Structure formats: structure tokens, C-alpha cells
Amino acid sequence: YVSVYLVIPVIMVGWIKALLGFLIITFVCGLFISVVFQLAHVVQGTQFPKPNSLSNKIENEWAVHQVNTTANFATHSKSMYWLLGGLNFHMEHHLFPRISHIHYPQVSKFVKEVCQEYDIVYVEYTSMFKAFWSHLVHLRRLGTA
């Protein structure tokens, strides 16, 4: 890691440009990751269950917990799907981490059906803007609680 991202660039372009490049890459990657995590977990409709104080266990089953604590966003946007590597289908990512992201759109149909059958809320925002707005509303609610 250090040699690929720091040593080789320092040798090739000097330490100032290498450091600047490293900082830009780190900032951009951090921005993408933080946006994905915030829009997938910290929005209206997702839950934040606390474990039982005696057993230290979550009440729901693992799969139900994944659905309750996660939201999808911009699932009809091919550009967001490509840019985020399918992480806008975050619920399916949590439920099926070993399945390639190219299958998430099809898997999401199955997950929606199962959620409907078992009366589990499936949180999905049709656009990134709607998810971002929900995130802001949720933060405001947390800040005034």
C-alpha cells in the first residue's frame, strides 16, 4: 500500500505532487464512502435498534435487522449504479455480500417481494436527491430531539 500510493509516486513526480495526489485521492474516496454510508443508513425510515441490556442481543433476526437498518437510493439511475459499484442497492449488498453487484437490481425485486410478504418495511429513495433530503430531515430531527 505504502509503496504503491506513496513511494512510487514520490520517485516519479516528487514528494509535493505525490502528497497532493494522495490527499486528493483520499478526500474523493472518503467523500464517496461517507455519502454512500449516510444515504444508506442515516435517513428517515431506517431503524437504530439497541441490543437487549441483559443478553446484549438484537431482537430481530439477522436478515430483518439488515433490512430495517438499511435503505436503497437512486436504484433506477444507471450512472449512480455504475459510479457507486452497485452500493446504491445497499440493502442487497448487506443481505447478499458474496453476490456480484451486477445482480443487485434483480435481487432487489426478490427482496421487495419477501419484505411485502412478511410485512417488513423496504426503504427505497428513487433519487439521490430524495435520499439526501431525507438524510437532512433526519439529522434535523436528531438535532432537535
Listing of model-derived features with the role each one plays in the protein:
Residues Y1-A145:
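Hydrophobic transmembrane helical bundles of multi-pass organellar membrane proteins
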